[in-house]
Amino acid sequence: MIKDIKSVLKDLNQHKYIYVLRISILQFLMTTIGAYGLSLILRVILISSNIPGMTTDNIVSFLTNPLTLAVLFVYFLLLTFLVYLEFSLLVENIECKEAKLGVRLFYFKERSYHFLKSILGWHFLAFLFYLILTIPFVEFLVSSALLESLYIPNFISGELVKSTNGKIIYFGLYAIFAYFNLRFIYALPLAVTKKDNRFAVALKESWWLTRGTKIFRVLGFASVILIIVAIISLLSAAGIGLAALVDGCEKTFWVETLFLSFIWGVLFAGRLVFKLAFLSYLLKGFDDEASQKLPIKENKKQHRMLALTGLLLVIGGINFTYNALKASGGPSKNLSVIGHRGMVSQGVENSLESLEAAAKAGATYSELDIILSKDGHFIVSHDDNLKRLTGKNITISQSQAEDILGLKIKQNGHESHLISFEDYVAKAKQLGIKLLVELKPTGNEPDNYEQLFVDKMKELHVASSYLVMSSDLKTIEKVKRLDSAIQSGHTISFQLGDFTSQKVDFYAIEDFSYNELLARKAHQNGKKIYVWTINSRDDIERYLETSTDGVITDYTTSVRKIEKELAADDSYLDYFLRLTNLSWIEKL
């Protein structure tokens, strides 16, 4: 193991320039042409289904369209091929080193043939399963440039960790996924090097290579990671020190732009080195005698150095332009901070105590969920079944209001009682805080459900001052038709493509599906956009510097505190920690 680590580090140092040149080109092509090809197919999928975007509202009709399914298959086929091709080229670079790459038309034809052979039949599903399996760990493993921005949506993990059983399930699954990732760590390198292998065979062989104590060979690479992290840290520290020396705490435009560009370059190079080193180390685990081609002549090396210089200038120019635009922007102004079900750290979700805590913390709105009881009363609750908070298997939509109002609810050491929508609104008026009401239809509602809600809003005299949203698009659009004064919104937990409705006033979109392009489109159409559920310090800081209109959070106090810190425009060290999602270090 030590011998392999030394060999990998020596190889990286000896061929660093050619590796940087070739792998930078590969990453650039994958994240531009490859990503564009995938987005183009995605657009074809949406057009073929006659919808502007896919959400949880239309996913059934989306997946029952034969043409859509056919194009979706092509999309996944192209995705898996691009991942396979990327790793094939990475291995080719490691084997060729300074020698000339034999990447011509024949090479792509050959790789396409071997790819199709390796995923034929059910092996295609095995490949997709493998890619999905790696998503929780793309930051820690050798992953494709096309997959590095993927992660488990927070609305899935966030809901799970709110209960003890959920935490056990979440961390248990994480541990199982981590174990399988370690056991299948050799699968993709095996698939691209052993060209006659089917992918499931590669999975099986990887499982064999990591049996027993052999799994510790993979963990031994941690020493190389520490070396790479140390180098990145030293270079970053030098950049921080130089920027602080030149600029102090003023953050002038040009110094800030250069600082952002330098940090991006260091992190980009570090990621490339990590990917190459880890892949090279894995190859030595089963293919130590890999063929290596003859080195090129000295004059060719000079040409490569010129090409490397040119490439760095191009990438550096793009990087500088991007960061110049970023540096010219500023934090969001007048950002709405919306307490998610009140403030759950200070009380049971959707309780009066939680509402009061959100108001004291300075929330712009407090979000709550309401469900209609069997006898037509709106009850404040996120779940139709009350077992999670009451311990009793009672369903709101099948119960009389008098039988459930006042039930004791418990969560995270807090206690309260189930209350009506009317009592909740009365308390909000007393506290001087507005509400964001989320309608939670269960399927048991009467035909006049939306009219009942509109009438209730008018009765409480809050129809024009509160925000109302629902994940059921038909419900919220009907509410808007019944009373145009109500500020209505669509709750979106997952979305691909454009917004599916222009009839609402705002969108509340989950963090996983948010991007700045969607925000700009919403604003161009006169709509607002809110993001949920933003809880970590890094996510809060990131969204405070986007064009979103507001964040829905469990930690209202944290958002207000971080707002003040960003407004103070502190040191370059703080700036660096925010850029690299390492702000938590300051709290150690």
Annotate each predicted stretch with a short phrase:
Residues 219-220, 490-492, 497-588:
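C-terminal active-site rim and adjoining tail of enzyme catalytic domains
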Residues 382-486, 525, 579-587:
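Metal-dependent phosphodiesterase/phospholipase catalytic core, i.e.
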Residues 340, 358, 369, 404, ...:
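Conserved, mostly hydrophobic/aromatic
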Residues 334-338, 365, 432-436, 465-467, ...:
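Structural preference for beta-strand elements that scaffold enzyme active sites
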Residues 372, 385, 441-443, 474-475, ...:
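Active-site-proximal loop/turn and secondary-structure-junction residues that shape catalytic pockets
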Residues 324-375, 379-380, 387-389, 394-398, ...:
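Membrane-interface segments at or immediately adjacent to transmembrane helices
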Residues 1-337:
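Hydrophobic alpha-helical membrane segments
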Residues 341, 368-370, 437-439, 470, ...:
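A cross-domain feature marking catalytic cores of carbohydrate-active enzymes
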